[in-house]
Amino acid sequence: IRNGVVTGLETDYIAPGIGRELSKGILPKPIIFRTHGSRPADILSGHSLIDIAFIAAPASDSMGNCSGKYGPSACGSLGYAFADAMKAKKVVVITDHLMDYPLTDASITEDYVDYVVNVPAIGDPLGIVSGTTRMPKDPIALKIAHRPSMLPVC
């Protein structure tokens, strides 16, 4: 950000540490907040443009056919990354489980991938949590979190 490589952000959440820095006006473009679910639609419609997408894939072959079903970091569907892969100018698949070519039941196919990077581990599953999925500790946030359970089901 300080070097001008990142000039704007589109997100559904910002952690407090980076939020404090961003609130000082260090980005030349405004931050766009949107719901988690509307992100793929905005990408596919061309409203949100992606220069480069880094897709963490639990398994990939050397050409970029990748899946979330295999490997030590298996997580299930990579569906949330479809829009990124389809619309980004460049796509980098990062994996910790390189499989033989071709990975035939890929979620994202090589047609959309420019580069594949094999790393020792794509992440620590225990550390993958955001402020939106972490249980709140303060009384007001707990009260807000509890409220939806009080709504009648029709």
Task: Enumerate the predicted regions with their spans.
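Conserved alpha/beta enzyme-core scaffold
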Residues: 1-154
